[in-house]
Amino acid sequence: EIAQCLVGSEMCIRDRSAGVVIVYGVGAAYVMPESDVLVYADMARWEIQMRFRRNEISNVGVDNRMERASLQYKRGFFVDWRICDRFKKTLMSKWDYVLDTNVMGDPKMATAAIVDAGLKKASKSPFRVVPFFDPGPWGGQWMKEICDLDRETPNFAWCFDCVPEENSLYLGFGEVRFEIPSIDLVFSYPRELLGNPVYGRFGDEFPIRFDFLDTMDGGNLSLQVHPLTQYIHCLLYTSPSPRDTERS
């Protein structure tokens, strides 16, 4: 039924003899897989989380803007982002333009070619992702002083400083700062970034989450439990990169 709806929508668009038709939204390329121009609107997941917390956006395919942000995040992490990442990988080689939507009301657009050039350069040189800080019930006070954070926010618990799935990456085009999810770099150049041994084991996924945990003058830290690699593979968290798909 959904497939028939998509086919019907595509035929309706193709039957138009004049004018410009803009198809936009999550999964728009499903509706019009062979478009004249493909603009991919991208946003870092930390910004998505901030908009969840401000009750500004819903998860994919539902109207749950007023739901608890923690539940929206779980749905995003385990459902929305898994689906959208797989679809993104099939589109990256087809992008004409990339849209930076991280600052509300101030979008920036760059050609896919120049964005790819920036990612390629990053894969071969030192770089860091954009860190973000988050409070927690057991958090401490040390990072406030060391990182010059907001003194009014109680208990900073986390500094996420190398979590490509959720951090962002700044690319500089002249005087313009262009922000994209740093996971785009992992998807685009996984072998160059990770090396063959790591890529062979984990695919185009960054296998480690680096973060600083502050418990100074705070509470006890939670117990961390990490799965075996075999279990991760069973959950299909790893998959071929778009470039390897092109090679095959």
Where are the model-predicted features located?
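Single conserved hydrophobic/aromatic residue that forms the stacking wall/gate
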Residues: 2-8, 237-247
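ATP-dependent NMP and nucleoside kinases share a basic, alpha-helical "lid"
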Residues: 13-59
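Solvent-exposed alpha-helices and their adjacent loops that cap or buttress functional pockets
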Residues: 31-32, 91, 215-216
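Glycine-rich loops and low-complexity Gly/Arg-rich segments
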Residues: 45-50, 62-67, 122-126, 235-236
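Short C-terminal domain-edge/linker segments immediately following a structured domain
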Residues: 51-57, 67-76, 128-133, 189-193, ...
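Transition-metal
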Residues: 95-100, 104-239, 243
